[in-house]
Amino acid sequence: MPEEHEHTASAVGGCLCGKVRFEVHGELLSVVNCHCSKCRRFHGNVGAYTSTQRENLIMIRDEGLKWYRSIHDETPNVHRGFCKACGSSLFWDPKEKKNISIAAGVLDAPTNLKTSRHVWVDQKGDYYEITDDLPQNAGKFERANGENQ
């Protein structure tokens, strides 16, 4: 990775095998835990996402990056990014919005992020309980800036 990027990135992350690496140059929003059936299938459990403006995401290595267009999501025209080599679930990209969501677990530590809420709790799996006091939404959550997660 070029040295000039190391000092300007607010976050760095990537997949398990290293064939996808990226930097975020800008603000990352708080983590939102998505309990919808699509995120649970994509991640194998709850989808924990942060997000940033699309132009803040800089791909350093993307030879493994593959996009799946999810036509059955509640949000139309969503693309889910994953590594085709190792299978890591990486991105949730609603093309009509200005932000792209990044799976919080693929960010290198320390992230300094905090979880702020749960969404789509009406679809949560029956094999776990939500035991914190964070706000819960039955459906999607619209941030003040109009972005949803």
Regions found by a protein language model. Give the residues of each.
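A short Gly-Trp-Pro
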Residues: 1-149
